[in-house]
């Protein structure tokens, strides 16, 4: 199946330039869809906002997506992309729609398939194809989202593989002809995607053609994760795609040099689908179809293109003009690329026939470097990184990393170190050699490197079957491989055996596995000479001659080896060892040895070895004399005074002799943290005031960083590293600055915050770093920041600009709210809007009209500096704002052409569609123990059994489900340590009473009256104690009810005697005092730990108490017998909704709960003015017993319900709108 499609498409590509379609998001945006459009009927009651979930439209608006497909096909597109850019389970998690990923991918492929087939039927001479799209996800596998923890990852390779596998299967099942891995900004994500795709192909028994398309993100010409175009290509070349290309981020002008480079280096067809130019000052794409076609025609005439299409800002008209531009132009002819081993880190490394000897740094090996082993054992990873950095600075073109030591967790150490290496551009620019005798360590390492690395090593020692299995996986991971000359019989120690084993391995790898011969690197075993054992004397000669044999008989294979092994007999005399290495390598290189694992800082030059010593060494290495060993031993003593070896190359630390100002600047530019505190302190002592250090050398260094970044000479990982150094320096100076009450100068003070309800801040952090590098003072409030805090800090700190960020769709409404509050409170600051779900359209239509001062949509970090400069310049601001407002007016005019389609229902209609319960046939259970029950100083040992540990790990940003998180390759060990620490605290809490758990519950006679619930003082039901006010879902529902909590309590008129429960529990009595003690001691870890444990105890208490209520106190489920896992999954009868959460979102309803139970007086829990509970580790809510009761979400409500709710609560409309704001439609 796959081979036929590939042959068909390749035949087409050789004849003409094929057309890919254009921007799907651009076209969807043109429809001006509203929330209800995204929801459709099926998701009308979904608990979170869905607007912006474009992939969901294949289910809710399939006719619209098909209409877009037809438009592109009519314009001339040969290849349709499925509407699945964000359809992986990982990306769909933003909407809690992971379970729909497979269905969405299938439906999207099916829609595209139907459209393509219709057009193929119209003109069989122009067949149309479907490319199943796999987007990059919203996470990065090779970049930490936390600038303070470069080793942390928020997604693993295995999680990506699982997500991409599910999407791939569905895309194929839906009818895709090709798989398109596109908009790659993190190559490791793409490698995981390719791994998943190839695994699915193997599973299905056929392969489809694969297209790969990456994204160059800035002027440096690199991906977001730091790779050059060629390095990126080398990293994914193993996939053998039908096409390799670039898309998004840049317009044709900016993208041209990278397309040209790709066309030069790629053995396969080249594709590109650029944006319609760069976004202008207002965030829109200006390049017209005609202008874009001119660029495309020039590319075609220059011989760059095999496939062309469009990305952001492009439309069917752009594709139509592109089609006309390339008509009659010859497609790019595939070039003859010389066979070579093409490796990569952030930069490419090509090893060809004419390449000089490649040095592989050996010092990052715990078995070969005592210093490195000590640093890893003591977890001094910053210093261990220095070892790697020194190797690269001293000339290592590859670094070998080995963690095999009995007292180390080799797998965890390998993962941690490789993740940290990825954050150090000076190290990660070179390819990585993952070195281990344990396959699981090798595999864990391969899952951490975005470049094309080398595995060291595999062999035939355990037989052919194991050898083939490992080789296939290495190829799928995209690595080259070192093969040891070792089989079931043993290691090859003679020239003949070396060639025999290597030949056997080569034939298996190349002929059977399909491994590229240029990616096979043989290690024919370097053994020690001059050992005093005659049988060892010819070891070096055997190796040197075997090198020539292998190069002659095994085409394109390479040769490597551990060079230091040859001199092992002279350990302790480094000078002589280096002489042996120099002589040995000289003869090996002459015979064709390609690379060697060496100490890059201690390589001697053959001609620099003293003649007398060199001759004696040569006698040993070439086995020219029977007494060669004895003669070398004698001569070696003459060099004993040099036995310490050459001193460490002083040039690496030459900068330490510079002035302190220059040292600080150098440290910032290079991202060196080792000396930053001592240098900052020296600069402080030299300055008349501490602020001068920031405004002088530190800012000078950051200005250099900003300039280099702006010029494309420095890229994002380096900038982030520089920011880390700056933070450490400023942290040291802050106490002195505060003591002297100094105020510094900057280009402006900018407040950044991820809005309430959103935890995503990668983009915000990058913007902050870039602005800091351009001398803006940044106040970063972090994530989940409420409006009131943003505005309070903005006033207190007298900031010049406020910047809001958000990734998930509910953040858009929160941004509107912030703008309204800024207007209401009389702010006059510019407001910046950014984040993945934000858009110019939303900014213009929903946000800008609510605020009288500039609101600017900033779609990337590089644009932020120009925008801020314009906004804070008296000269530039008027013209900038005038253009901005004119542009937004145009956007609004376009938006208003389409009338919003909404499907609300009246409150009367919603009430008529309440939950249908036959109350006459149902007898509500009376409680066994009515009234209020208090649990003071409750037994912590009991609560421990009910803890749900998964959220505990999330508190520490460790993603994974308990207890399987302990097996997680990246976070498992850390999770175990946290778990142990938490349980140690729980032991202390039990034994010493450090925290108190208090709780209470009550069961009260109740009846529903419309949407509200009356709670009575006693069983006579004559006096109402409290009325609980509820909201009802108010969206049209062809199927299902419009839910309200009152539906689950017997109506007053039914005469049935029903009940309701209330509860409040806390695990945090004394929590604040304990945490404050630790903070005062500088122990943030235990401060956070005690709060996290208290939070888990509160949730466990809520779970325990609900179970006890069901089984004993109310007793309606006396026979219930559920495990803790089943309790966590809510497999029981009844619900316990909490005020402030989806089923009852209005927070003031906690008030009646507090009063019914007399909570504050009884157990000390209180409510703040905004109805937040105190202590923070607290839970409260209601108990409903009806077997049909279920959780649901109240989304948007209409004005009639707002008025009804206000009247029932005794509020005026203004008060109602304040508390119901998030749920009010419009």
UniProtKB/Swiss-Prot annotation:
Domain B12-binding stretches: 747-882
Binding site for Zn(2+): 248, 311-312
Naturally occurring in which organism (per UniProt): Vibrio vulnificus (strain YJ016)
Domain Pterin-binding: 357-618
SMART domains: B12-binding_2
Cofactor note text: Binds 1 zinc ion per subunit.
Further details from the record: L-homocysteine is bound via the zinc atom.
Binding site for methylcob(III)alamin: 695, 757-761, 805, 809, 861
An example molecular function term from Gene Ontology annotations: methionine synthase activity
Protein purpose: Catalyzes the transfer of a methyl group from methyl-cobalamin to homocysteine, yielding enzyme-bound cob(I)alamin and methionine. Subsequently, remethylates the cofactor using methyltetrahydrofolate.
Protein name: Methionine synthase
Domain note: Modular enzyme with four functionally distinct domains. The isolated Hcy-binding domain catalyzes methyl transfer from free methylcobalamin to homocysteine. The Hcy-binding domain in association with the pterin-binding domain catalyzes the methylation of cob(I)alamin by methyltetrahydrofolate and the methylation of homocysteine. The B12-binding domain binds the cofactor. The AdoMet activation domain binds S-adenosyl-L-methionine. Under aerobic conditions cob(I)alamin can be converted to inactive cob(II)alamin.
Enzyme Commission identifier(s): 2.1.1.13
Superkingdom in the source lineage: Bacteria
The keyword Repeat belongs to this UniProt entry's keyword annotation: yes
InterPro entries (alphabetical): Cbl-bd_cap, Cobalamin-bd, Cobalamin-bd_sf, Dihydropteroate_synth-like_sf, HCY_dom, HCY_dom_sf, Met_Synthase/Corrinoid, Met_synthase_B12-bd
Residue ranges of every copy of the AdoMet activation domain listed in the record: 898-1226
Organism classification: Bacteria, Pseudomonadati, Pseudomonadota, Gammaproteobacteria, Vibrionales
């Amino acid at each position: 199946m796959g081979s036929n499609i590939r042959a068909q498409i390749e035949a087409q590509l050789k004849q003409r330039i094929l057309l890919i379609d254009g921007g799907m998001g651009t076209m969807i945006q043109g429809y001006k869809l509203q929330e209800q459009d995204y929801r459709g009927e099926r998701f009308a009651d979904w608990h979170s906002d869905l607007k912006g979930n474009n992939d969901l439209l294949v289910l809710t608006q399939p006719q619209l997506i098909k209409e877009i497909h037809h438009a592109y096909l009519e314009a001339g597109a040969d290849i349709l992309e499925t509407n699945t850019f964000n359809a992986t389970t990982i990306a769909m998690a933003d909407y809690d729609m992971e379970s729909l990923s497979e269905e969405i991918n299938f439906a999207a492929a099916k829609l595209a398939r139907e459209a393509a087939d219709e057009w193929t039927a119209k003109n069989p001479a122009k067949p149309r194809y479907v490319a199943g799209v796999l987007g990059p996800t919203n996470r990065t596998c090779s970049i930490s989202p936390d600038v303070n923890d470069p080793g942390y990852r928020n997604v693993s390779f295995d999680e990506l593989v699982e997500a991409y596998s599910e999407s791939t299967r569905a895309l194929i099942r839906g009818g895709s002809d090709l798989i398109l891995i596109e908009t790659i900004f993190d190559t490791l994500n793409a490698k995981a995607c390719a791994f998943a795709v190839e695994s699915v192909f193997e599973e299905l028994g056929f392969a489809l053609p694969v297209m790969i398309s990456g994204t160059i993100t800035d002027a440096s010409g690199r991906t977001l994760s730091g790779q050059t175009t060629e390095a990126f290509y080398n990293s994914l070349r193993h996939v053998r795609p039908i096409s390799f290309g670039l898309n998004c981020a840049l317009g044709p002008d900016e993208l041209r040099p990278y397309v040209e480079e790709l066309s030069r280096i790629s053995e396969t067809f080249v594709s590109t689908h650029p944006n319609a130019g760069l976004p202008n000052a207002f965030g829109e794409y200006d390049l017209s179809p005609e202008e874009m076609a001119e660029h495309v025609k020039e590319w075609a005439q220059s011989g760059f293109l095999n496939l062309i299409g469009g990305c952001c800002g492009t439309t069917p008209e752009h594709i139509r003009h592109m089609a006309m531009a390339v008509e009659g132009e010859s497609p790019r002819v595939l070039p003859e690329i010389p066979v070579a081993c093409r490796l990569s880190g952030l930069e490419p490394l090509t090893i060809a026939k004419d390449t000089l000897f490649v040095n592989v740094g050996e010092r990052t090996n715990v078995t070969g470097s005592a210093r490195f082993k000590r640093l890893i054992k003591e977890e001094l990873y910053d210093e261990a990184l220095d070892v790697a950095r020194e190797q690269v600075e001293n000339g290592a073109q590859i670094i070998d990393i080995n963690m095999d030591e009995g007292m180390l967790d080799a797998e965890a150490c390998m993962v941690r170190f490789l993740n940290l290496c990825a954050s150090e551009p000076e190290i990660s620019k070179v390819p990585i050699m993952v070195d281990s005798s344990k396959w699981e360590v090798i595999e864990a390492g391969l899952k951490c490197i975005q470049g094309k690395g080398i595995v060291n090593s595999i062999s035939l020692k355990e037989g052919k079957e194991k050898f083939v299995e490992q080789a296939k996986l290495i190829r799928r991971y995209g690595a080259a491989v070192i093969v040891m000359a070792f089989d079931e019989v043993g290691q090859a120690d003679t020239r003949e055996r070396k060639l025999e084993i290597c030949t056997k391995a080569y034939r298996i790898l190349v002929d059977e596995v399909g491994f590229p011969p240029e990616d096979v690197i043989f290690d024919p075993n370097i053994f020690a000479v001059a050992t005093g054992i005659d049988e060892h004397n010819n070891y070096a000669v055997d190796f040197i001659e075997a090198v020539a044999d292998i190069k002659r008989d095994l085409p394109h294979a390479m040769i490597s080896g551990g060079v230091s092994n040859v001199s092992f007999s002279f350990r302790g005399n480094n000078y002589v060892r280096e002489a042996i290495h120099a002589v040995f390598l000289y003869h090996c290189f002459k015979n064709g040895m390609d690379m060697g694992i060496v100490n890059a800082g201690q390589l001697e030059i053959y001609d620099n070895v003293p003649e007398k010593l060199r001759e004696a060494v040569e006698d040993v290495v070439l086995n020219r004399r029977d007494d060669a060993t004895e003669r070398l031993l004698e001569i070696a003593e003459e060099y004993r005074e040099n036995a310490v070896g050459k001193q460490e190359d002083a040039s690496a630390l030459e900068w330490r002799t510079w002035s302190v100002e220059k040292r600080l600047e150098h440290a910032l530019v290079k991202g060196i943290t080792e000396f930053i505190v001592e240098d900052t302190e020296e600069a402080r002592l030299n300055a008349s005031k501490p602020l001068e250090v920031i405004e002088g050398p530190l800012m000078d260094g950051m200005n250099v960083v900003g300039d280099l970044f702006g010029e494309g000479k420095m890229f994002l990982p380096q900038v982030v590293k520089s920011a880390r150094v700056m933070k450490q320096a400023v942290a040291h100076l802050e106490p002195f600055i505060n003591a002297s009450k100094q105020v510094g100068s900057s280009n402006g003070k900018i407040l950044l915050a991820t809005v309430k309800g959103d935890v995503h801040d990668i983009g915000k952090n990058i913007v902050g770093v870039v602005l800091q590098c351009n001398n803006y003072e940044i106040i970063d409030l972090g994530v989940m920041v409420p409006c009131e805090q943003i505005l309070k800090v903005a006033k207190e700190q007298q900031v010049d600009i406020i910047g809001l960020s958000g990734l998930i769709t509910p953040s858009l409404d929160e941004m509107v709210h912030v703008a309204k509050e800024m207007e209401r409170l009389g702010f006059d600051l510019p407001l910046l809007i950014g984040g993945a779900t934000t858009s110019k359209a939303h900014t213009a239509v929903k946000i800008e009209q609510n605020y009288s001062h500039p609101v600017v949509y900033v779609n990337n970090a590089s644009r932020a500096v120009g925008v801020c400069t314009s906004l804070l310049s008296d000269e530039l601001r008027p013209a900038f704002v005038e253009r901005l407002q004119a542009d937004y007016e145009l956007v609004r005019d376009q938006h208003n052409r389409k009338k919003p389609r909404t499907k609300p229902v009246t409150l009367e209609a919603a009430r008529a569609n309440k939950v249908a319960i036959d109350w006459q046939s149902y007898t509500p259970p009376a409680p066994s123990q009515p009234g209020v029950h208090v649990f003071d100083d409750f037994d912590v040992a009991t609560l421990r059994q009910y803890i749900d540990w998964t959220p505990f790990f999330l508190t520490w940003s460790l993603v994974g489900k308990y207890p399987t998180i302990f097996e997680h390759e990246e976070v498992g060990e850390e999770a175990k340590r946290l778990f142990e620490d938490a349980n140690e605290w729980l032991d202390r809490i039990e034994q010493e009473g450090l925290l108190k758990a208090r709780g209470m519950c009550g069961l009260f006679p109740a009846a529903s009256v419309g949407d509200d619930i009356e709670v009575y003082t006693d069983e006579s039901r004559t006096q109402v104690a409290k009325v609980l006010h509820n909201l009802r879902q108010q969206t049209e529902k062809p199927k299902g009810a419009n839910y309200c909590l009152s539906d689950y309590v017997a109506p007053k008129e039914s005469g049935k005697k029903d009940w309701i429960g209330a509860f409040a529990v806390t695990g945090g009595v004394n929590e604040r005092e304990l945490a404050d003690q630790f903070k005062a001691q500088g122990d943030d870890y235990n401060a956070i730990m005690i709060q996290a444990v208290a939070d888990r105890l509160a949730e466990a208490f809520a779970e325990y108490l609900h179970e006890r209520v069901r089984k004993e106190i109310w007793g309606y489920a006396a026979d219930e017998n559920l495990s803790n896992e089943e309790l966590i999954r809510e497999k029981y009868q009844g619900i316990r909704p909490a005020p402030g959460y989806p089923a009852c979102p209005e927070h003031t309803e906690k008030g009646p709960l507090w009063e019914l139970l007399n909570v504050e007086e009884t157990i000390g829990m209180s409510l703040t003015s905004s109805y937040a509970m105190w202590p923070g580790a607290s839970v409260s809510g209601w108990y409903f017993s009806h077997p049909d009761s279920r959780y649901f979400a109240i989304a948007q409500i209409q004005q009639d319900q707002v008025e009804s709710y206000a009247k029932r609560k005794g509020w005026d409309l203004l008060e109602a709108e304040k508390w119901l704001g998030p749920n009010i439609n419009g």
